[in-house]
């Protein structure tokens, strides 16, 4: 067996005309098969790490076989081989499975009608909203919508509840007393797709050249590797190439397992359909109703719209929120404010649609490092590895001012390859401590290419900060720094919000979703007995009819009593009974309070009532004849006579004004005489303790009497003051009023 000796293997790192050589080793490998037993040959195995996004001539492998040893004699080969290896950008492929179509914006149509003409039954020949039919010509269940009627309380002018889409007027049974609510669909429809688990995909192209004695390079053949075909062999069996594996990307693909992909699909002439992928969206699966039975979700159907809970007491459109059109328009607003959208594809990364092996695929480009190991086994004696070192600069760079934790920070940098060769560059970032680290990026630029690089920027602090800084460094493939720029930017404090009230938001009421509807849910008004009948709620229907009959009977009775003159006397009788009962209770409470006040406030010495004697007399009421014993205690006959005279005059004064209540009693323990008189607002209490007559402060005529201004008072006050003056009563105090008998 011949022994083939290798020469040295060189790796060339070239910058224009300057080259650096690094030695490498070789390995020996034998292949043994049943067809060619013991067929051993010496191979050179080249292991390469290819980065993501490398382009033609960025990384080139040149292998030259120049000599071998035969029986100890070295022989120079006339021809050599050259291998050029390139790798396409790494992408993530997401297979799509069609789910179903969804309307962009379901709409509610409101038709004004009357109580007797609105029809929404499934067996009605011509319901107000009309029926919709499927492709087989069959009526679609619940496509007839539903009717809402003004309730009895609305017709009587007493209703104050929200009525869906209608304005109910008192005594109106004509147009506007009922409305029909119909579900209509907008012209634009979206197609939804399930998103499958991603697969990484890239291609590696290996060009094999031969170089003759005239140093002419001739293409011999091309090997094309991919994730679908990881191993290839040249036609002359001189070269074998394999993909060993790919490292996990430093920026992995987006996790789309919880989303549906939706894209405008028809009509084909719709402007949004013609926009292509820029109008596609990722929407969370929880925002959809696949059976159409849930309100305020994408895909709500006729049944979901018609069977919504308490439909007639909800605002118009209450079941048709959070639709695809709403999501799209909200993202347009965010984009107009230079903010990140929530649903459009760019919210998750850089995506495209491709056809792969006859299947519709969603493709995401990966911007981070995703190194791939490949091997090339060749019959060679010397290998040169060439890497172009570029010359580049950062022409522009900036970071916008943004709110902390808002996700709206963005770094933009323009990087240019100023060399004449395609080359690899590395961007490194060094930022202040409160800025979250930014991942370094590898760039592969063609000659004189200007590349616009951007990435998001975040800070770790909630508070505002001035002059945050980030330094951007540009390196070549072996770490030589080519350029450096420093960026200053400001951040504002985080704007905290809440949906639970106080200073940060408005409290929102919770919503309960019920799996089944009760009779009260199906019919918004208790008085709508026809609604209960149509819903099969017979018991509730009879309750409603009985209540209506009761109200009608009560109204008829009131009208009858009023017409025959009985209503006013009955009302007066009831009011009188109520007022008397309440007045009696108030006077009892007032007696107790005033007694206690007098006992605590009066401290005058007894002047004429030192000896106790008993006397009783009768007080007669004009309307009701009652007799009460009045026990008085006086120390002298003159004091007794004078006090009795004053009491009699006051009694006569009350009789003059037709008081409807008069009584007197005596508290034996405190010797307080209580006199009650004057009906309604003129009621007052007159006390006598020893030689002092007291009028409580809460008397309605106290201000007039206490100020002793009869010219401003009523006739009653003037008469009272005449009694005071005639009997030479001395005013001791006006608030409260104390009258001293002299």
Curated annotation (Swiss-Prot):
Q: Which residues form a coiled coil?
A: none
* GO MF term list: fusogenic activity; lipid binding
- Signal peptide as annotated in the record: 1-19
Q: What is this protein called?
A: Hapless 2
- Taken from the record's topology, the Extracellular segments are 20-540
Topology in the lipid bilayer is annotated as:
Single-pass type I membrane protein
Please give the positions of the paired cysteines in each disulfide bond. Answer: 30-40, 118-147, 129-182, 148-312, 150-168, 295-319, 431-470
Gene, per the UniProt record: HAP2
This molecule's function is given as:
During fertilization, required for the formation of intercellular membrane pores and subsequent exchange of gametic pronuclei between cells. Probably initiates the formation of intercellular membrane pores by inserting part of its extracellular domain into the cell membrane of the adjoining cell in the mating pair. Mating requires the presence of HAP2 on at least one of the two cells. Mating efficiency is high when HAP2 is present on both cells, and is strongly reduced when HAP2 is present on only one of the two cells.
Query: Would the keyword Metal-binding be found if you checked this record's keyword annotation?
Result: no
Native organism taxonomy: Eukaryota, Sar, Alveolata, Ciliophora, Intramacronucleata
**PANTHER family in alphabetical order:** GENERATIVE CELL SPECIFIC-1_HAP2 DOMAIN-CONTAINING PROTEIN, PROTEIN HAPLESS 2
List all topological domains (Cytoplasmic): 562-742
Q: Which organism is it from?
A: Tetrahymena thermophila
Per the record, the domain comment is:
The region that is important for membrane fusion binds to lipids and can insert itself into lipid membranes. It is unstructured in an aqueous environment and assumes a more ordered, beta-stranded conformation in the presence of lipid membranes.
The protein's UniProt keywords, in alphabetical order, are: Cell junction, Cell membrane, Disulfide bond, Fertilization, Lipid-binding, Membrane, Signal, Transmembrane, Transmembrane helix
Key word Transmembrane helix present in the record?
Answer: yes
| Annotated spans, Important for membrane fusion | 152-179
The record's Gene Ontology biological-process terms are:
fertilization; plasma membrane fusion; single fertilization
Compartments (UniProt record): Cell membrane; Cell junction
Q: Which GO terms describe its cellular component?
A: cell-cell junction; plasma membrane
Extra facts: HAP2/GCS1 family members mediate membrane fusion between gametes in a broad range of eukaryotes, ranging from algae and higher plants to protozoans and cnidaria, suggesting they are derived from an ancestral gamete fusogen. They function similar to viral fusogens, by inserting part of their extracellular domain into the lipid bilayer of an adjoining cell.
**Could you say which protein family the record assigns here?**
Belongs to the HAP2/GCS1 family.
**Where exactly are the transmembrane stretches of this chain?**
541-561
């Amino acid at each position: 067996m011949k022994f083939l000796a290798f020469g040295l293997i060189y790796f060339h790192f070239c910058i224009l005309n300057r080259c650096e050589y690094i030695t490498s080793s070789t390995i020996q490998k034998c292949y043994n098969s049943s067809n060619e037993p013991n067929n051993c040959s010496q191979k050179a195995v080249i292991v390469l790490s290819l980065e993501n996004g490398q382009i033609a001539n960025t990384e080139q492998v040149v292998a030259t076989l120049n000599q071998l040893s035969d029986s100890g004699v070295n022989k120079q080969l006339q021809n050599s081989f050259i291998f050029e290896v390139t790798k396409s950008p790494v992408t993530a492929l997401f297979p799509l499975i069609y789910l179903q179509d969804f309307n962009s914006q379901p709409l509610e149509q409101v038709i004004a009608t009357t109580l007797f003409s609105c029809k929404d039954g499934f067996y009605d020949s011509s319901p107000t909203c009309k029926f919709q039919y499927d492709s087989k010509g069959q009526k679609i269940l619940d496509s007839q919508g539903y009717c809402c009627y003004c309730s009895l309380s609305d017709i009587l002018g007493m209703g104050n509840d929200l009525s869906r889409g209608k304005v109910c007027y008192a005594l109106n049974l004509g147009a506007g007393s009922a409305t029909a609510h119909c579900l209509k669909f907008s012209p634009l429809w979206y197609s939804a797709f399930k998103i499958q688990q991603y697969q990484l995909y890239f291609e590696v192209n290996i060009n094999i050249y031969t170089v003759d004695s005239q140093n002419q390079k001739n293409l011999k053949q091309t090997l094309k590797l991919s994730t679908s075909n990881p191993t290839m062999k040249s036609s002359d069996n001189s070269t074998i190439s394999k993909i060993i594996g790919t490292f996990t990307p430093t920026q992995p693909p987006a996790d789309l397992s919880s989303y549906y992909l939706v894209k405008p699909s028809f009509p084909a002439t719709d402007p949004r359909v013609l926009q292509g992928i820029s109008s596609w969206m990722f929407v969370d699966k929880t925002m959809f109703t696949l059976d159409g039975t849930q309100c305020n979700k994408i895909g709500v159907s006729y049944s979901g719209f018609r069977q919504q809970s308490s439909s007639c007491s909800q605002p118009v459109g209450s079941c048709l929120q959070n639709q695809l059109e709403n999501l799209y328009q909200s993202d347009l607003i965010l984009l107009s404010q230079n903010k990140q959208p929530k649903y459009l594809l760019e919210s998750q990364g850089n995506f495209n649609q491709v056809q792969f092996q006859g299947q519709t695929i969603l493709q995401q480009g990966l911007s981070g490092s995703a190194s791939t190991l490949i091997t090339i086994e060749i019959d060679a004696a010397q290998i040169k590895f060439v890497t172009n070192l570029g010359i580049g600069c950062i022409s522009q760079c900036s970071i916008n001012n943004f709110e902390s934790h808002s996700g709206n920070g963005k770094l933009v940098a323009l990087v240019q390859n100023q060399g004449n060769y395609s080359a690899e560059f590395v961007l490194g970032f060094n930022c202040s401590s409160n800025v979250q680290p930014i991942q370094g990026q590898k760039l592969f630029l063609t000659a004189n290419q200007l590349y616009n690089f951007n990435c998001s920027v975040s800070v770790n602090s909630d508070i505002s900060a001035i002059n945050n800084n980030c330094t951007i460094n540009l390196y070549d493939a072996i770490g030589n720094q080519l350029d450096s720029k420093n960026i200053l930017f400001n951040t504002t404090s985080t704007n905290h919000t809440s949906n639970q009230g106080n200073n940060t938001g408005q409290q929102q009421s919770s919503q309960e979703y019920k799996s089944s509807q009760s009779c009260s849910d199906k019919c918004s008004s208790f008085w709508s007995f026809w609604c209960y009948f149509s819903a099969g709620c017979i018991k509730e229907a009879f309750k409603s009819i009985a209540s209506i009959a009761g109200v009608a009977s009560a109204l008829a009775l009131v009208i009858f009593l009023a017409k025959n003159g009985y209503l006013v006397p009955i009302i007066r009788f009831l009011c009188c009974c109520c007022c008397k009962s309440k007045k009696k209770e108030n006077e009892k409470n007032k007696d107790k309070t005033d007694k206690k006040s007098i006992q605590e406030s009066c401290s005058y010495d007894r002047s004429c009532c030192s000896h106790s004697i008993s006397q009783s007399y009768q007080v007669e009421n004009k309307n009701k004849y009652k007799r009460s014993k009045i026990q008085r205690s006086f120390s002298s006959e003159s004091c007794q006579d004078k006090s009795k005279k004053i009491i009699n005059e006051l009694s006569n004064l009350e009789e003059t004004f037709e008081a409807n209540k008069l009584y007197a009693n005596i508290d034996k323990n405190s010797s307080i005489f209580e006199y009650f008189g004057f009906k309604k607002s003129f009621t007052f209490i007159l006390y006598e303790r020893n030689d002092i007559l007291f009028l409580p402060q809460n008397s309605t005529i106290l201000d007039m009497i206490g100020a002793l201004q009869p010219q401003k008072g009523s006739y009653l006050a003037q008469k009272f003051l005449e009694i005071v003056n005639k009997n030479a009563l001395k005013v001791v105090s006006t608030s409260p009023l104390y009258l001293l008998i002299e």
